[in-house]
Amino acid sequence: MSATIHNVRPVTDNLGRAGSGELVPSRYAVRVGDVDVVLISDGVLPLPTSTMSTNVSEADRNAWFDGRFLQRDMFDWALNIALVRSGECLILIDSGVGDGFEYFTRAGQSMMRLESAGIDLAAITDIVITHMHMDHVGGLNVDGVKARLRPDVRIHVSAKEVAFWKDPDFSKTVMPETVPPALRKAAAKFVERYRENIVPFDQRVEIAAGVSARVTGGHTPGHCVVDVASKGEKLTFVGDAIFEVNFDHPDWQNGFEHDPEASVDVRIALLREAAETGAMLAAAHVAFPSIGHIAKNGDRFRFVPVTWDY
């Protein structure tokens, strides 16, 4: 695939000044029992719509985008990270895309937005990386970020994920041709820079009271989700297991999935789990703030966003 990446025009070019004066909301907080969760927008990633549905016809894809008054050729992928406070632990989930990617000029805002929220990077005790794609590790690769983190920060990544990126397989992906080299470079830089901080885990790890990560595979072999559970309430941050189109079409495959068929199975299992338990769900690439519940709608699912809490 050789599609050229270009920016879709944003709703507004005037975002206001950086930091707390931004006109566009960039963070949203919820409480899960005794645990605080903040979703933070890193920005958006303009990508070809074909990457959202590699196994369906152009007509079916166009119908979905037309029904949402969206462009047929390019789609702005939301990019969200999360910050979780449990007791004395402050946990960052993913880090955004960072800088250095000229075709993603409307993302890479996470570190600035953490700072504008009053978060000192040195206060972060743990980081969970759902997977090692550049839009999840890139924020940590920005020059100067490591020096602002505490020297003993624990970075939790599944052992399968670390092993995969030693020799990644892109044979089942359908990406713009510029992306695989950038993914390899970002993953290698992340491992080299944070080798002493990475704490690999097998299938599941408890990070703090009520906060755990579990491997799902699919999107990448070591992809994980993060569960926040406290006092009978639950929220699952699903990383890249679920995309915007997948509530209506969980079987639509994504061009960034290294195992598309396994990804469909993972996606359906997570959607069923949320629908049956009533747990909240949040995702890296669902429109900000991405928090909602899942309702069953025949053979499909329906995303029910939380009502914005003013």
What are these regions (language model features)?
Residues 25-26, 46-48, 132-139, 164, ...:
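Active-site environment of divalent metal-dependent phosphoester hydrolases
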Residues 34, 84, 94, 124, ...:
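Divalent metal-coordination and catalytic microenvironments
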Residues 73, 105-156:
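Active-site metal-binding motif and surrounding structural segment of the metallo-beta-lactamase
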Residues 104, 231-310:
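Cap/insert and terminal regions of metallo-dependent hydrolase folds
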